[in-house]
Every structure is written in C-alpha cells, then in structure tokens.
Amino acid sequence: MASELAMSNSDLPTSPLAMEYVNDFDLMKFEVKKEPVETDRIISQCGRLIAGGSLSSTPMSTPCSSVPPSPSFSAPSPGSGSEQKAHLEDYYWMTGYPQQLNPEALGFSPEDAVEALISNSHQLQGGFDGYARGAQQLAAAAGAGAGASLGGSGEEMGPAAAVVSAVIAAAAAQSGAGPHYHHHHHHAAGHHHHPTAGAPGAAGSAAASAGGAGGAGGGGPASAGGGGGGGGGGGGGGAAGAGGALHPHHAAGGLHFDDRFSDEQLVTMSVRELNRQLRGVSKEEVIRLKQKRRTLKNRGYAQSCRFKRVQQRHVLESEKNQLLQQVDHLKQEISRLVRERDAYKEKYEKLVSSGFRENGSSSDNPSSPEFFM
C-alpha cells in the first residue's frame, strides 16, 4: 500500500496547506484501484466533461459516474501535463459519498447541479467536515499563491473540484448528523445536538469562499461558472444551518407547566379552564399534565375513601360499645327479676303449706294460688 501511494516530488504539491490537507485523511482507509487502459481513457473523458461545467445528480451507474474526480487534482486543462497526473485520479477519495456524477445524463449547469445535490442531501450518511476544511485551505492557497504554492497555476484546484467541495460543505452543514470522518474524531450525532446559528453559517461561508477561489484560479467561462456554483452551494448550506438551529424541541421556554400549576389548582380546575390555559402547548405536555391531574384526582379520591372508612369504623365501634352496655344492663335487670320471682314463689309455697285457709273462710278471700302470683 505504501509503495503504491509513493509519488515523485514533482507530482506532489509543495504547499504546507496542501500537505496538511493530505495529512488530515487516513490514507490506509482508501482503496487503490488500478483500472485498465479503457478505464483511464473514460476517466480522462469524464474529467474533461466535468471541467466543462456539466454536472448531474442522477444516481445512474455509467462509466463516467462510477469514477468520481479527485478533491485536489481535477481534470487538467489541455497542455498542462496530463500524463504526470493521470494516475492520481485512480484514488477513490469520496468512498462515503452516495451521489454519483453523470455528466452525460442531463445537461445541468453547475448552479442547477448544486441545488439538486443540496435538495437531496438528506440521503447522505455522514458529514464531510474534513473535506470542506481541506478544500477551503487548498482554495485559499491557490488564490494567494497562484503559481507559487501549488505548482505555478490555479489549475490544481479546478472549477469542478471547487463545485464538488462546496456541495460537500453545504451537505455537511445541512445534514448535521452521522460520525465525522477525521482520522481521530469519531463523535456521535448526539454530541452536536444543540447547534447554533453561527456555526452552520460559517460552514456555508467557507464553502462559498472555496467555490469563489476555484473560479478565480481556473480562468475562463467554465471556471467562472464553477466558482458561482460553489458560492451558491455555500450560501444554501449556511441558510439551512441557520434554519436547523431553531429546532422546535430546543425552545428556551421549556413548556413545563409544573411551576405554573400547583397540585391543588390542577385538581380543583375544571376541564374547560384547563384546556383554555393549555392552548398553544405541545401535545406531549398536555397529555402529561392531564395524566398528572388524573393521578392527583385518583389519589385524593382514595384518601377521601380511606378517611370515610376510618370515620365510619369509629362510629360503629362506639355504637357497638353502647349496645354492649345496654345488653349488660338488661341482663342485670333480668337477674333481679328472677330473684324476686323466686322469693315470691317460695313465700307462696310456705303459705300454702301452713294451712292458710280456714273452714269458715268467706268467699271474698281468693281460693286460687294464682292470686299470690
């Protein structure tokens, strides 16, 4: 792998910014694919067509669309030594980019291609912050030292590469999800859950500056069109990032009404009044408050029932004690009456046995023992 990546010093750019851009990527992750002679010819044709300003976002599988261009070395213009840089286009630098470039399918201008790619950017599976940063550095180096830092001309950062870099930066600013493909940065999407309006706008401006630098370095109608497309892509990314910063569930208010309504207010408030107070509140918050109100009502009903049961039990116990006292009193009365009855019966038996009756007793005296009862 190292022997295949080895290149002569004349082919490598001597700018420190370009070398830093190359060092930002883990080159061991990229696949090196050697194509036959026909594939090299097709690649050169695709490079010339892309440099002419015709881009397409259709995912069709064609010989031209199967080999994407290089980020830092676009198709060279005629007479710029294409034999020395032809093997550089064999490196697949966009391994995670799902959109295929097919210049022969539709006759899109660079502006139309940028808009089409941005509109379909939700299909991307990861961000390309490293690519955008490297493209910005290369574009700045190409604009500052035209001919000194990148081999003597701005052709190293061609218009097609500038347009593609601007599209990638805009897509990364708009999607804002997925892991970053730096060699040492592997952040989850949740770490960037609270975006600000300034960061996506900065990414969009960086993409616009990269596109403008590519257009200035190329020189000619096609280069000017590529620069304009890159600037448009950057602006779109900045606008999308600024809009994405205002996510609905990150509102500063919080929409939590626990402090606004006390438990007593939730229980005593009527349903109509509660619905009037909850106008404009999210559905989840309304459901949560109504469930809390129902729980408080059930809890209050259970406490009321428990209190009533305890109170009724106390009343019944007091009545039971009173009834037991009355029963005891009645038992005492019964026992007293039984004793009196026994005493009278014994007295009667004594009188009968002593010969109470006499022979000449008058009829006024009772003759039946029941009289003494």
From Swiss-Prot:
The keyword Nucleus applies. Residues 316-337 are annotated as: Leucine-zipper. Keywords: Activator, Cataract, Chromosomal rearrangement, Deafness, Disease variant, DNA-binding, Dwarfism, Intellectual disability, Isopeptide bond, Nucleus, Proto-oncogene, Repressor, Transcription, Transcription regulation, Tumor suppressor, Ubl conjugation. It comes from the Eukaryota. Residues 180-195 have a biased composition (Basic residues). GO terms for molecular function: DNA-binding transcription activator activity, RNA polymerase II-specific; DNA-binding transcription factor activity, RNA polymerase II-specific; identical protein binding; RNA polymerase II cis-regulatory region sequence-specific DNA binding; sequence-specific double-stranded DNA binding. GO terms for biological process: in utero embryonic development; inner ear development; integrated stress response signaling; lens fiber cell differentiation; megakaryocyte differentiation; negative regulation of transcription by RNA polymerase II; positive regulation of gene expression; regulation of chondrocyte differentiation. Residues 359-373 have a biased composition (Polar residues). It is found in: Nucleus. GO terms for cellular component: chromatin; cytoplasm; nucleus; RNA polymerase II transcription regulator complex. Residues 126-373 are annotated as: Represses ARE-mediated transcription. Expressed in endothelial cells. Induction: Up-regulated with tert-butyl hydroquinone (t-BHQ). InterPro entries: bZIP (IPR004827), bZIP_Maf (IPR004826), bZIP_sf (IPR046347), Maf_TF_N (IPR013592), TF_DNA-bd_sf (IPR008917), Transcription_factor_Maf_fam (IPR024874). Residues 211-222 have a biased composition (Gly residues). Ubiquitinated, leading to its degradation by the proteasome. Ubiquitination is triggered by glucocorticoids. Residues 288-313 are annotated as: Basic motif. Pfam families: bZIP_Maf (PF03131), Maf_N (PF08383). There is a cross-link at K29, K33, K331 (Glycyl lysine isopeptide (Lys-Gly) (interchain with G-Cter in SUMO2)). It is linked to A chromosomal aberration involving MAF is found in some forms of multiple myeloma (MM). Translocation t(14;16)(q32.3;q23) with an IgH locus. PANTHER family: TRANSCRIPTION FACTOR MAF. Acts as a transcriptional activator or repressor. Involved in embryonic lens fiber cell development. Recruits the transcriptional coactivators CREBBP and/or EP300 to crystallin promoters leading to up-regulation of crystallin gene during lens fiber cell differentiation. Activates the expression of IL4 in T helper 2 (Th2) cells. Increases T-cell susceptibility to apoptosis by interacting with MYB and decreasing BCL2 expression. Together with PAX6, transactivates strongly the glucagon gene promoter through the G1 element. Belongs to the bZIP family. Maf subfamily. This is Transcription factor Maf. It comes from Homo sapiens.
